[in-house]
């Protein structure tokens, strides 16, 4: 049975880069991993495969949406460390529902019997306020992971995601594994002071602290995971948090919680008082 992860966070927070590096860390520790990009931009797997691969929606269009005519080879590309990548895709900008495509991708995975093929399935999901379609991965996930930075907008989005996870946990098995602090900067960004307080308030923990480092940004543009980049100063330190996350997830029963989110209005007044 696959370990299913759903990675969420505010738009532009670094979810795909973080997801790809978590997938890489897991794969290098021996896990067979499938990463699923759930964003119309279809660039989640770019650091893994080094290209923008064909999306599920594009493959379905080619067969007039007859799922039974598709095989795994039509929608899956294998990249770094043997990681398989799949991109849900989406409708043209300004039309259609991207969340619907996520649901279609989940259906296709089930029909192809892929849930039993992998040790880990990681959904990299668009969005900070989760609609029905984009929340679909939470129906299947064992654990949700929130990516956040040490600022109000990111924390507000994380709190909204905690609301979605709490709601889904009533009917489904999903729990929150924790928050990954991304782009941590102790010089100008306050480190993780606000994230630490938020995590304690909602009943979760910081899984790891990913530093703000130019090498991570460069790896994204290069179409590589950080693990695949040439050795250079700072690389080893940047790899530490991704390996910490992988080690945590590969435990027999990783500790996780159902978060207790803060009310929308309450969080505005509360965060303003955090230092």
UniProtKB/Swiss-Prot annotation:
Q: Tell me which UniProt keywords the record has, alphabetically.
A: 4Fe-4S, ATP-binding, Bacteriochlorophyll biosynthesis, Chlorophyll biosynthesis, Iron, Iron-sulfur, Magnesium, Metal-binding, Nucleotide-binding, Oxidoreductase, Photosynthesis
Binding-site positions, [4Fe-4S] cluster: 97, 131
Q: Which Gene3D superfamilies match?
A: P-loop containing nucleotide triphosphate hydrolases
Q: GO BP, one example?
A: light-independent bacteriochlorophyll biosynthetic process
Where along this sequence does the record place binding of ATP?
12-17, 41, 182-183
Whichever gene encodes this chain, its name is bchL
Q: Which domain of life is it from?
A: Bacteria
Name of the protein: Light-independent protochlorophyllide reductase iron-sulfur ATP-binding protein
